[in-house]
């Protein structure tokens, strides 16, 4: 970090380099001297801020951020690689045969180690530049408090791709009729490394221009601010029809009386190129008000309160990340026709595709908030907020809202609605002494969403509807145990998913029709997408330059479906089995039928057992030490000797421990 300058020019710059090495075994990532297939990430960031006072009335601000990033891995993706490692039993075959070829067998026909070491590499190089330039002109010569600003900004993010592929041969070993091993080779023995330099894989360019006029006056106990702004944005992504444009015309007015009563009003006229012709603009207002009670005379005698503020706000915003062709109808070439009676040969023709949207609109979010801020006892701060968000015009599938009798595919519609209510709290206590200081803070948020309209259409039973539940609410079957024997199966409702046997999961018949099918699902657990509760604790201290900072984070009211193959759902389609199933759980057998908590083992793809249900539902809440930072600040006298303001050495670690309910997976 470098900072300096004088009266007319000031600068600040930060250079940051980070190298993240992968966790793959170097014995195999260094398998060949032609390339290294280890997962690697390199980051190099350079930030520079420059402030120039051209004159006393004219100022220039330049901010720039440049980033170089390189990501490298085997040509086998991380997801595929770890899936193969999970699913391949460790004793299924040797990593390499005695002939030096990669091992495999006739069932799996893959080798995760070979797919790590001997398939080449995939590399992405990312180049990013973010720059903005702002000119500020004081116009007090015209009238006191008047100023103007001109700004331009340019972001360019480009990614270049290089792939080096090769194939390998693997060998299976089987016992012959004479008892001797029989070796069979599969795959391509070609050892050539085919390098494909795609060059520019994708590019995103974001540019904007802004012109703004500001006015600020104070007199007696009054403080008045106003501004008018015009902004033009353009965003371009690699590919066809990926450019979009936005315009903002924004006016703001703010008034403060005696630093006690404050009101701010914003009027935003927003235009988007994705909207139809002659229908490009929408209005998005906002208003906020605040009352600083601690500045009132009746609070002067209450020494415990250093600051007390009550505030409320309302605002509307829009969302326009939509495709361009939603208001157009296309004809597709999969139609057919017949000429003359008795002709059985169909001719090709066009037919109507999905209908066009009649009027595409923007998603709208109306946000209401009321809050209280306070500071107490010369060191304690506290804030509490209550909020209500109402989202409407959400783009959803229209097929559930219009009858299929129309005879053509229904387009999406701006008909979705979601409400969210919640509260947020935060507090901090700080104390400083001569050589020692410490702090401890906490935050908590609770937000519960409710789907009002999702376009799901008619449901034969009310409990099947996702309306009224949070976003991402988990739905599935209620598991009520396991079939004990054939008599139990005979006397129970018919489960339609697959043939059941003793030890298979037994589900509740919600509609009482003696059949277990898709009509017996219901809401189970919480959302699997968004936790309702977030909380955190941050604390630290410093003593004579030595300090520790720690951040703890947690979530609650969150569900996880344990459906990872081989880990929680074992042996399906010749996959693996984990310690979780073998040792941590009690699988169903004739001897354990009274205490079992997971179904019987089977190598078949058991559609009855392996589906979303309370059998596999787990509490997804956790509490973890997210960050720990230990540092030492050298005495300032040492720093001054080398012309620096501050010298600090530190050690930092992430995710040191976690308390949760999900074993083996994060």
Regions inferred by a protein language model and the residue ranges of each:
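Glycine-rich, aromatic-lined ligand/substrate-binding cores of catalytic
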Residues: 528-563
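Catalytic-site beta-strand/loop segments enriched in glycine and acidic/polar residues
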Residues: 226-234, 262-271, 507-530
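Transmembrane beta-barrel wall of Gram-negative outer-membrane proteins
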Residues: 1-74
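Conserved small-residue
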Residues: 1, 76-77, 326, 432-529, ...
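Extracellular/periplasmic, surface-exposed regions of secreted and cell-surface proteins
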Residues: 49-58, 63-68, 73-78, 83-85, ...
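Residues embedded in well-ordered regular secondary structure
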Residues: 1-27, 194-198, 215, 489, ...
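Extracytoplasmic gating/loop element in the C-terminal half of outer-membrane beta-barrel translocons
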Residues: 95-97, 114, 502, 555-648, ...
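Aromatic-residue-lined binding/catalytic grooves and analogous aromatic/hydrophobic interfacial grooves
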Residues: 21, 136, 485, 537
């Amino acid at each position: 970090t470098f900072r300096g300058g004088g009266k007319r020019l000031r600068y600040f710059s930060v250079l940051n380099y980070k190298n993240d090495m992968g966790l793959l075994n170097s014995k195999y990532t260094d398998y060949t001297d032609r390339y290294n297939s280890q997962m690697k990430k390199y980051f190099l960031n350079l930030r520079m801020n420059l402030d120039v006072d051209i004159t006393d009335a004219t100022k220039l601000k330049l901010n720039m951020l440049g980033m170089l990033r390189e990501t490298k891995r085997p040509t086998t993706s991380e997801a595929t690689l770890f899936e193969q490692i999970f699913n391949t039993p460790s004793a299924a075959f040797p990593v390499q045969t005695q002939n030096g070829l990669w091992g495999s067998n006739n069932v799996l026909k893959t080798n995760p180690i070979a797919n790590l070491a001997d398939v080449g590499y995939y590399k992405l190089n990312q180049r990013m530049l973010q720059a903005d330039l702002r000119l500020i002109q004081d116009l007090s010569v015209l009238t006191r408090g008047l100023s103007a600003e001109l700004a331009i900004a340019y972001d360019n993010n480009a990614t270049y791709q290089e792939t080096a592929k090769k194939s390998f041969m693997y060998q299976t070993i089987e016992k012959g009729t004479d008892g001797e091993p029989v070796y069979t080779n599969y795959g391509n023995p070609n050892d050539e490394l085919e390098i494909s330099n795609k060059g520019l894989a994708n590019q995103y360019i974001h540019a904007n221009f802004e012109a703004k006029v500001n006015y600020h006056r104070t007199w007696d106990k009054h403080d008045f601010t106003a501004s008018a702004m015009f902004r033009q944005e353009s965003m371009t992504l690699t590919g066809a029809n990926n450019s979009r444009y936005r315009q903002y015309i924004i006016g703001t007015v703010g008034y403060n009386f005696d630093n006690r009563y404050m009101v701010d009003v914003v009027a935003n006229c927003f235009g988007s190129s994705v909207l139809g012709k002659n229908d490009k603009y929408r209005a998005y207002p906002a208003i906020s008000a605040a009352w600083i009670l601690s500045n009132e005379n009746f609070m002067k005698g209450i020494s415990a309160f250093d600051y007390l503020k009550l505030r409320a706000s309302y605002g509307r915003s829009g969302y326009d990340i939509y495709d361009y062709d939603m208001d157009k109808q296309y004809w597709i070439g999969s139609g057919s026709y017949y000429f003359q009676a008795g002709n059985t040969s169909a001719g090709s023709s066009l037919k109507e595709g999905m209908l066009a949207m009649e009027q595409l609109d923007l998603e709208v979010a109306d946000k209401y908030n009321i809050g209280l801020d306070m500071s107490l006892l010369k060191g304690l701060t506290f804030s509490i907020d209550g909020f209500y968000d109402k989202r409407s015009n959400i783009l959803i599938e229209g097929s559930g809202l219009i009858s299929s009798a129309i005879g053509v595919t229904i387009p999406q519609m701006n008909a979705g609605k979601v409400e969210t209510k919640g509260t947020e709290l935060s507090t901090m206590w700080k104390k400083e002494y001569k050589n020692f200081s410490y702090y401890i803070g906490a935050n908590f948020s609770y937000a519960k969403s409710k789907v009002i309209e999702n376009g799901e259409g008619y449901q034969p039973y009310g409990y099947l509807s996702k309306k009224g539940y949070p976003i991402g609410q988990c739905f599935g079957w209620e598991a009520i145990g396991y079939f004990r024997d054939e008599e139990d199966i005979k006397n129970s409702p018919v489960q339609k998913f697959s043939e059941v046997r003793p030890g298979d999961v037994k589900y509740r018949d919600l509609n009482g029709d003696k059949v277990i099918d898709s009509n017996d699902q219901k809401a189970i657990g919480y959302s699997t997408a968004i936790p309702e509760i977030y909380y955190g604790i941050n604390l630290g201290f410093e003593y004579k330059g030595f300090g520790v900072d720690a951040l703890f984070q947690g979530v609650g009211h969150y569900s996880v479906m344990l459906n990872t193959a081989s880990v929680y759902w074992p042996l399906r389609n010749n996959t693996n089995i984990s310690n979780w199933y073998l040792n941590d759980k009690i699988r169903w057998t004739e001897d354990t039928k009274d205490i079992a908590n997971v179904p019987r083992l089977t190598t078949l793809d058991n559609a009855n057992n392996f589906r979303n249900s309370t059998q596999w539902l787990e509490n997804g809440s956790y509490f973890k030490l997210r960050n720990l930072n230990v540092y030492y600040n050298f005495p300032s006298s040492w720093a001054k000797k080398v012309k620096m303001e501050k010298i600090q050495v530190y050690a930092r670690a992430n995710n040191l421990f976690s308390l949760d309910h999900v074993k083996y997976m994060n």
